[in-house]
C-alpha cells in the first residue's frame, strides 16, 4: 500500500539580488545634464522657431548672426541626440535587469514544480508496484481456479463414464443437484475472465481495485465452499459405490453358492441310483 505523502510548502522565491550586476543609479551630474538637455531642447525649439520665421529677413540683414545661430542649433541638436541615445541604452539595461529578475523567479518556481513532479513520480512508481503485486496475486488465484476447473472436468469425465451405473444406484435428485452445482461452478468460472479484464482497466483506481479484490475474495471463498461440498459429495458417492459394489459382489457370491449347492446335492443321488 502507498504511504501517505507529506505536502511540503515551497519556500518563498529568493529576492532578486543585483550584487554582481547592480543597476547604476543616476548621479547628481547626470541629473544636471538631464535638466540642461530639457532646457536646451526648449531653447532649441524656440531658436528654431525664430530661425524659421526670421530666416529670410535675418539672412538679408545679418547673414553672420544667422550662420552662428544655425551652427548653435545643429550643435545642440547633435548633443541632445547623443544624450538621448545614451539614456535610451540605460533604460533598456534597467528593463533587461527587471526581466532577468522575473526570469529568475520563474526559474525558481519551475525547480519547485520539478521537485514536486519527481516526488509524484516516485509515489506513482510505488503505487504501480503495489498494483502489480495485487495483479500477480489475482492471476495466481485465477490459475488455481483453472486447475480446480480441470480437476472438475476430469471428475465429470469419470462421472460420464459411469453414468449408467450411477443411474441404477442413485436417485435422479442427487444427480440433478450435482449437475446444478457443476453448472453454477462453470458460470462463476466464466465470470472470472471478464472480471480480470475489468481489473486491468481499473488498475489506475486503487479504491475500486481494492473493492474488486474483496469481491474476488468473496467469490473465491464461495468457490472453496462449493469445492468442499463437491469433494464431500464425491467422497460420499465413492463410498456408496464401493459399498454397493461390495454388496453386489456378496450377493453374487451368495447366488453362486446357492446355485452350486443343489448341484452338489444332486450328484450323490445320481450315484446311488
UniProtKB/Swiss-Prot annotation:
Keywords associated with the record: Coiled coil, Host membrane, Membrane, Secreted, Transmembrane, Transmembrane helix
Main location: secreted
Gene3D superfamilies listed in its UniProt record: 1.10.287.1490
Topology relative to the membrane: Multi-pass membrane protein
Coiled-coil spans in chain: 206-233
Localisation: Secreted; Host vacuole, Host pathogen-containing vacuole, Host pathogen-containing vacuole membrane
UniProt signal peptide: none
Any one GO CC term of the record: pathogen-containing vacuole membrane
Transmembrane residue ranges: 41-61, 64-84
Region (Disordered): 1-20, 253-273
Top-level division of the source organism's lineage: Bacteria
Induction details: Detected 12 hours post-infection of host HeLa cells.
Chain's role: Chlamydia replicate within a host intracellular vacuole, termed an inclusion, which is formed by fusion of many smaller inclusion bodies. IncA may be involved in the homotypic fusion of inclusions; injection of anti-IncA antibodies prevents homotypic fusion, but not fusion with exocytic vesicles.
Record-stated family: Belongs to the IncA family.
Description of how the protein assembles with itself and partners: May form homodimers via its C-terminus. Forms homodimers, and probably higher-order oligomers.
UniProt domain comment: IncA proteins share the same general organization: a short N-terminal domain, a large bilobed hydrophobic domain, and a C-terminal cytoplasmic domain.
The name this protein goes by in its record: Inclusion membrane protein A
Organism: Chlamydia trachomatis serovar L2 (strain ATCC VR-902B / DSM 19102 / 434/Bu)
Amino acid at each position: 500500500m502507498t504511504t501517505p505523502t507529506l505536502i511540503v510548502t515551497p519556500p518563498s522565491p529568493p529576492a532578486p539580488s543585483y550584487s554582481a550586476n547592480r543597476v547604476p543609479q543616476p548621479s547628481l551630474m547626470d541629473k544636471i545634464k538631464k535638466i540642461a538637455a530639457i532646457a536646451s531642447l526648449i531653447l532649441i525649439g524656440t531658436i528654431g522657431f525664430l530661425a524659421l520665421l526670421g530666416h529670410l529677413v535675418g539672412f538679408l540683414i545679418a547673414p553672420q548672426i544667422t550662420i552662428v545661430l544655425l551652427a548653435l542649433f545643429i550643435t545642440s541638436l547633435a548633443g541632445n541626440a547623443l544624450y538621448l541615445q545614451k539614456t535610451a541604452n540605460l533604460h533598456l539595461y534597467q528593463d533587461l535587469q527587471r526581466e532577468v529578475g522575473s526570469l529568475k523567479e520563474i526559474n525558481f518556481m519551475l525547480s519547485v514544480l520539478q521537485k514536486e513532479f519527481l516526488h509524484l513520480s516516485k509515489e506513482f512508481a510505488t503505487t504501480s508496484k503495489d498494483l502489480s503485486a495485487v495483479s500477480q496475486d489475482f492471476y495466481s488465484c485465477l490459475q488455481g481456479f483453472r486447475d480446480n476447473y480441470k480437476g472438475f472436468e476430469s471428475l465429470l469425465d469419470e462421472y460420464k463414464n459411469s453414468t449408467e451405473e450411477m443411474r441404477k444406484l442413485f436417485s435422479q435428485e442427487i444427480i440433478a443437484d450435482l449437475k446444478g452445482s457443476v453448472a453454477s461452478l462453470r458460470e462463476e468460472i466464466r465470470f472470472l475472465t471478464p472480471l480480470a479484464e475489468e481489473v486491468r482497466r481499473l488498475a489506475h483506481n486503487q479504491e475500486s481495485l481494492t473493492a474488486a479484490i474483496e469481491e474476488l475474495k468473496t467469490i473465491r471463498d464461495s468457490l472453496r465452499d462449493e469445492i468442499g461440498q463437491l469433494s464431500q459429495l464425491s467422497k460420499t458417492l465413492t463410498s456408496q459405490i464401493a459399498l454397493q459394489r461390495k454388496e453386489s459382489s456378496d450377493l453374487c457370491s451368495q447366488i453362486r453358492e446357492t446355485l452350486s449347492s443343489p448341484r452338489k446335492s444332486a450328484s450323490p443321488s445320481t450315484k446311488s441310483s
